[in-house]
Amino acid sequence: MASSCLLLACVVAAAMVSAVSCGPPKVPPGPNITAAYGKQWLEARGTWYGKPKGAGPDDNGGACGYKDIDKAPFLGMNSCGNDPIFKDGKGCGSCFEVKCSKPEACSDKPVIIHITDMNTEPIAAYHFDLSGHAFGAMAKEGKDEELRKAGIIDMQFRRVRCKYPGETKVTFHVEKGSNPNYFAVLVKYVGGDGDVVKVELKEKGSEEWKPLNESWGAIWRIDTPKPLKGPFSLRVTTESDQKLVANDVIPDNWKANALYKSEIQVD
């Protein structure tokens, strides 16, 4: 009886080892991609998700908190990034040139994408899970569907400065649930670095800049026992320490779930 139990245990253990070893090996993430823009192309793997010609998520959102990423200025040219690209939300809004030369459907011509979401699949040191639209944009003319059928491809990328049309300014969305004691804001359409590492708030008549805490994605928040009084000015710091000040951008009669456009943008 004991030998039978031992045999059974050995079989189960062998099955467990076999199950663990199945599938492609996990690849550790590479070093974080910073705002040091260079000409060198780096290797990555590319996949796509969502509808074949869509913007990625079914709700046109994603882990950065952006909304309507199918519309201008993103226009569906979006991607998830793995850890060294998404950087726990601090990579949200950053821009990359991406291209592929294989399979045959690839054009080898770079297109620009925005980081709007995250992925955690350990298939490469750098992994872009692009929208169906962005993935197809790397293809030769008329071969986008053929390229999407490839599924997983080797691709090249490099960080670039974000450039928005002249009428696009840094925009703030006051999140649902915000009130005088809790203020949460989504920051989007930041040119240059694209990503934000610090947000501060100054009340009308005050000289104090109060730091906000990163909530998730591109959303920042502040909790305060003393009610905040508008209008508010917001100061945004990008990864390369460029500071942008939007004076009185949030009016004194501000509302939750509302969009406020500034007059500022990175040159």
Swiss-Prot record:
Main location: secreted
Cellular component per GO, a single term: membrane
Top-level taxonomic group: Eukaryota
Keyword Chloroplast carried by entry: no
InterPro entries according to UniProt: Expan_Lol_pI, Expansin/allergen_DPBB_dom, Expansin_CBD, Expansin_CBD_sf, LolPI, RlpA-like_DPBB, RlpA-like_sf
Keyword list, A-Z: Cell wall, Cell wall biogenesis/degradation, Disulfide bond, Glycoprotein, Membrane, Secreted, Signal
Pfam families per the UniProt record, alphabetical: DPBB_1, Expansin_C
Compartments in which it is found: Secreted, Cell wall; Membrane
Disulphide connectivity of cysteines: C64-C92, C95-C162, C100-C106
Topology of the protein relative to the lipid bilayer: Peripheral membrane protein
Expansin-like EG45 domain boundaries: 61-167
Listed PROSITE patterns: EXPANSIN_CBD (PS50843), EXPANSIN_EG45 (PS50842)
Signal peptide (from-to): 1-22
Residue positions with a glycan: N32, N213
CDD domains attached to this UniProt entry: DPBB_EXPB_N (cd22275)
GO BP terms, alphabetized: plant-type cell wall loosening; sexual reproduction
Domain Expansin-like CBD: 181-262
Function: May cause loosening and extension of plant cell walls by disrupting non-covalent bonding between cellulose microfibrils and matrix glucans. No enzymatic activity has been found. May be required for rapid internodal elongation in deepwater rice during submergence.
Similarity comment: Belongs to the expansin family. Expansin B subfamily.
Protein name: Expansin-B10
Taxonomic lineage of the native organism: Eukaryota, Viridiplantae, Streptophyta, Embryophyta, Tracheophyta
